[in-house]
Amino acid sequence: MAMNHQGMHSGHHDYTPLLIAFLAVAGGVLLGMIAAIGNPILLIGTIALFAMAILAFAPRLLFWAVLAGGLVVAGLIRLYLPQLQAFRWLVAAGAIALPFMLAFHAMFSHRQGESTSFPSFLIWAAAFVAYSALSAFILSHGWASAILGLKDYFQVWGLLPAFLLLPARPDFRKTLLTLVLAIGVIQVPFALHQYFFLAPLRAGIPSVMPADIVAGTFGGDMNGGGNNAAMAAYQFFCIAIVLGLWKNGLLGVRRMLALTACLAVPVFLNETKVSFVFAVLVFVVVYWNEIRQNPLRFIQAGVIFVAILATFVMFYVFVAENTDRIHGLDQYLDLLVEHNLFRGYGTYQLNRATTLTFWFSEHVPRDLFHALVGHGLTQTREASAFVDIGTTLAARRYAGMGIGVTALSGLLWEVGLIGAGLVIALFVSAFRLAGKLARECRDEPIRQAFIKGTQAGIAVTVLSLAHKSLFMFEVTYQVFVILLLGYLAYEFKQFRSAETRQPAVIG
């Protein structure tokens, strides 16, 4: 009887397979016609659009496609197929459409027992989105500028509510963890190719560091910069997870060392100096409880950790000596200090430190209004294919200065102390929530290791705000950031679903 009852579903029919079949047939006919024309870009574009249409009926598949597309495909297209860069926008289009598709499916799925709670860091996120939109149009420098600014800031933020709208499945966490670590591992072959084959081709380009192109799947420009720091941040996120799995007894020493070494190879190759600080942050966050409870054991582990850092330093010194940039460790350390505190970054007059002091001197006390609210989105941009950069603050008043050389300085100039404060509050709230969730799942070692690794990833992201400007426009890095925040939101929802069905806002 139970089987018969389940078989009769109130006359409900699922037409999704028929719709997908129709789209596939229609797409095949259209693709045949376009192939006859012989335009490869038009052909690829049509394939991508039909793939998006089919994925509309499979939002879970679209979710994984956006994650993998943002962390792998988008960066590779930018570096290896720059003529197809427009297709990177498909990641943004998928991220925007995804929450609407999931919400639509949720309306007809009749889910039971799922919490409607949401973490408090989402309030800070929503406040930043609302404030940025308000700033874009009140401090408007034209509709195109406002729309471009909002697109650059929030092009993949649709992934954040998507994590909350995903229906709970027991295999989701394992699948996500597998994907995260797999993407970390596949950075290795790409980094090796970029180091041995692409970096030497950049040796003669003025004001360009050859090793910056070693960015794995996070992309770069053969004639400009690369997202090597973004790849380093992602690799340390993966390393933090591996350390957590080892600490919780899920990995043996040999496997832990092998995985850590594999994940660290791209970081060694791309010479990202901030990796030293990333490593310290990861170590402290993952082992914070042990540091507080057993300082002596921490000192012992710290000796090993310092030895690893020393290996990093000596490798970088060796590479620099062989490229005739410096001679000896002392000169290398002097170069680091000069590069970050005294000399301009690249071709700019300002560097990561002086861009902040310059912002302060330009606003306090003579322009407190713009210090609070900023000058408007895109005002630190010095190049764009869609907006007349001659009207931006960076091009009009501060040409060649580099006022947006980091995300922190860029946020201060564009959305002021209010906007920058909302971003900091967002990450602080998420960091604290990760700590609480990790304490709540002591009996679930895989879950705790993943959450603790995410907490370390958030710490790395906060530091990155003062190191690079990627947070404000780079789709690959933004997918990584939203992955961290979205996973925390998902875990929060799972905890609340296990406790209560009543709406709540905590965290």
Task: Give residue ranges: language-model regions.
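Long extracytoplasmic/lumenal interhelical loops at the membrane interface
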Residues: 201, 346-415, 434-442
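N-terminal signal-anchor transmembrane segment
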Residues: 11-107, 134-135
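Interfacial loop-to-transmembrane-helix boundary motif in multi-pass membrane proteins
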Residues: 63, 113-129, 151, 163-192
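A membrane-periplasm/extracellular boundary helix in multi-pass inner-membrane enzymes
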Residues: 195-198, 270, 287-344, 364-366
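Transmembrane alpha-helices of multi-pass inner-membrane enzymes
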Residues: 24-28, 238-243, 427, 452-507
